[in-house]
């Protein structure tokens, strides 16, 4: 299981609202979210992100993005959420994979100017 932990973007007391449910980005509203997919040009002028590599294929049971973080052009952020898991019940290894995280940020015109930052920690907990 891989979890993401940390706060949403902040600049002093100003914040960008975390996306509590999986949804697409909407220009002009406060949103901060992430996913583990290769996103299309619906979110930017060029595709952003990547698929988990190598992918699970029903035989190797490698890790994969979890629900809420595995839909193209849809994003979510809740600290403590599991974003990826092998869920193979000990049926085999799931090593040597590359996970790429894509982030989205949208703000309204009324968002106070500033340098918005966050520190996110990804924790991988192995199970045997």
Give, region by region, the residue ranges found by the protein language model:
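Signature of Gram-negative chaperone-usher
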Residues: 1-128
């Amino acid at each position: 299981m891989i979890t993401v932990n940390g706060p949403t973007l902040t600049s002093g007391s100003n914040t960008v609202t975390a996306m509590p449910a999986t949804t697409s980005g909407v220009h002009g509203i406060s949103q901060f979210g992430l996913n583990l997919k290769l996103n299309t040009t619906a979110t930017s002028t060029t595709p952003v992100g990547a698929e988990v590599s190598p992918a699970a294929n029903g035989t190797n049971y490698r890790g994969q993005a979890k629900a809420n973080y595995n839909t193209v052009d849809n994003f979510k952020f809740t600290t403590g959420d599991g974003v990826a898991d092998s869920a193979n019940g000990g049926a085999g290894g799931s090593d040597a994979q590359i996970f790429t995280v894509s982030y989205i940020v949208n703000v309204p015109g009324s968002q106070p100017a500033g340098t918005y930052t966050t520190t996110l920690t990804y924790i991988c907990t192995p199970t045997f």
